[in-house]
């Protein structure tokens, strides 16, 4: 069973920001943000034509500065937020803003005329998330199942919830909490849980992971020394409400049950350098992607701690006698966790991996040299999960 070859797209600038266009569930579309100190930065809107295995792109100018993170609105496919650096009074500030893709490019079907981006249009600014009193922005993330009017941002040691008003042209700080403790505490990443009516978020600072209830803005759990070194990224299992994945500079990926935080449920040690990104598949949570500065992307099958530890079970009424026997064998014991594939198309640090929001079997990875690689889950595993 021949697997499709990876599709590679090169940007002319260095890049570390990648997001799937969350609200787009028909077209396979990714957003990539560049990091250039000398030139105008860009967001490349990447459309992947699955049938012909080709990439179409649109380039949008992001005049505000080099892009450190992109987060796509869950409700409006044409709205996104970025964290970016700007120079002010010879100091570097990391800021955040909400943008709209210009109307002419909203369908995603008008390819940019050339690679020079000389005719590229600029993103339309909707509003800034004003962090002048709170320090440098570390990340911005949208309320997962919301109407695209609520955002979480982390800046230094502040956790802030924002409401967007007046067609998203105005941001209002609705609540905030300060991380307090010894030394200079600083958030590095955060994730909004899709469970519990979206009332919980998880944050990372140094080697610790903390859970917060955003109704009371109080800490609800803290995993001290979750990793031996800095925690880089977090992701919630979309189908198991208490399960959380983390990765860090200790080269490890850990899986946690937030009801019992004394030790991880599972630990992966497949990477040989810092792990920057971890992502659960939105539909099949046993599939977990990780990207690392060892320049590799690893796809793991974490079936034993997934929502279907015994595989895909079928109702008894739908089975013949022969199938019944097979099904009995299948249900006797949980399936084994394993590394499915290691992807080595990158030659530089892989800072981001993302699953497509339109096709659960397809994902993208981005390395610092501006190389975007689109890959698929191996067919054999896909059919094994489905059948």
UniProtKB/Swiss-Prot annotation:
GO cellular component, one term: Golgi apparatus
Gene3D superfamilies, sorted: YVTN repeat-like/Quinoprotein amine dehydrogenase
SUPFAM superfamilies cross-referenced by the UniProt entry: Putative isomerase YbhE
Annotated protein name in UniProt: EARP-interacting protein homolog
Family as reported in the entry's similarity comment: Belongs to the WD repeat EIPR1 family.
Biased composition (Acidic residues): 315-326
Subcellular location: Golgi apparatus, trans-Golgi network
Domain of life: Eukaryota
PANTHER family for this protein: EARP AND GARP COMPLEX-INTERACTING PROTEIN 1, WD-REPEAT PROTEIN
Organism, as annotated: Xenopus tropicalis (Western clawed frog)
SMART domains named among the record's database cross-references: WD40 (SM00320)
Upper classification of the organism: Eukaryota, Metazoa, Chordata, Craniata, Vertebrata
The keyword Zinc is annotated on this UniProt entry: no
Region (Disordered) residue spans: 312-333
Function as written in the Swiss-Prot or TrEMBL entry: May act as a component of endosomal retrieval machinery that is involved in protein transport from early endosomes to either recycling endosomes or the trans-Golgi network.
Keyword Repeat carried by entry: yes
Ranges occupied by WD repeats: 132-172, 182-222, 226-266, 270-310, 345-385
Keyword set, alphabetical order: Golgi apparatus, Repeat, WD repeat
GO annotation, biological process: endocytic recycling
């Amino acid at each position: 069973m021949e697997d499709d070859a990876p599709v590679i797209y090169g940007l002319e600038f260095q890049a570390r920001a990648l997001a799937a266009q969350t609200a787009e569930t028909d077209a396979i579309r990714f957003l990539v943000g560049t990091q250039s100190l000398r030139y105008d930065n860009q967001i490349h809107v990447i459309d992947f034509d699955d049938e012909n295995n080709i990439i179409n792109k649109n380039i949008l100018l992001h005049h505000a500065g080099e892009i450190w993170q992109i987060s796509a609105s869950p409700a409006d496919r044409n709205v996104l937020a970025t964290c970016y650096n700007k120079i002010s009074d010879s100091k570097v500030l990391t800021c955040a803003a909400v943008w709209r893709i210009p109307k002419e490019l909203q369908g995603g079907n008008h390819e940019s005329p050339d690679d020079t981006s000389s005719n590229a249009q600029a993103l339309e600014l909707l509003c800034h998330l004003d962090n002048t009193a709170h320090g440098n922005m570390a990340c911005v993330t949208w309320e997962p199942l919301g109407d695209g009017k609520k955002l979480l941002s982390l800046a230094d040691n502040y956790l802030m919830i924002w409401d967007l008003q007046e067609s998203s042209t105005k941001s209002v700080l609705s609540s905030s909490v300060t991380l307090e403790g010894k030394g200079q505490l600083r958030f590095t990443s955060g994730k909004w849980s899709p469970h519990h009516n979206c009332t919980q978020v998880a944050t990372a600072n140094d080697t610790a992971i903390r859970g917060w209830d955003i109704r009371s803005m109080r800490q609800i759990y803290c995993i001290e020394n979750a990793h031996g070194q800095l925690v880089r990224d977090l992701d919630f299992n979309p189908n198991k409400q208490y399960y959380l994945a983390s990765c860090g500079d200790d080269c490890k990926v850990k899986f946690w049950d937030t009801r019992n935080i004394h030790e991880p449920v599972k630990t992966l040690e497949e990477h040989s350098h810092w792990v920057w990104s971890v992502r659960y598949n939105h539909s099949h949570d046993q599939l977990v992607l990780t990207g690392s500065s060892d320049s590799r992307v690893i796809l793991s099958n974490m079936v034993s701690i997934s929502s279907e530890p015994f595989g895909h079970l079928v109702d008894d009424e739908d089975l013949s006698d022969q199938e019944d026997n097979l099904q009995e064998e299948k249900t006797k014991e949980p399936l084994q966790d394993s590394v499915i594939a290691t992807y080595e198309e990158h030659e530089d640090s892989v800072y981001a991996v993302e699953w497509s929001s339109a096709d659960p079997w397809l994902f993208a990875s981005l390395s610092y040299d501006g190389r975007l690689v689109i890959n698929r889950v191996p067919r054999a595993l896909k059919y094994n999960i489905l059948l």
